[in-house]
Amino acid sequence: MRKILFTVLLCIGVLNLHCSKIRERKVPEFMTAKRPTPELVYQCAKHYKLQHINIVVAQSILETGHYKSDKCINYNNLFGLYDSKNKKYYRFKTWQESVKAYKQKVQYKYKSGDYYAFLKRIKYAKDPKYIHKLKKLS
């Protein structure tokens, strides 16, 4: 009987310790942030394993006018991602989804080399000075 009681108490103690460790794990700040900042976009891009993160963050700043544009505020679209099939800008539930979509819709095409040249090659932006502006920000 004592062995059973000891085993039960030991199991309860181990379970409590395990549960407290789960509670201690914190959700990364960027996951719960309602509004993007360069630092949070950087963390999110790193989490999703985007390449050339500094350039991607600069794109988010440039595309949204420092996160103040209509597309950023109302669509959570940090990169001006456009659905050419439906002729509409993508709408995301969260800005974090926009970062994830950037990897899926833009970076999947990138293999290696100069990222600025890649953006120019895929005609990411219509503005002929886009790369120059991006370099100033990144």
Model-derived regions: residue spans:
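Catalytic cores of secreted/periplasmic lytic hydrolases that degrade extracellular macromolecules
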Residues: 17-138
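Bacterial Sec-dependent N-terminal signal peptides
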Residues: 1-23
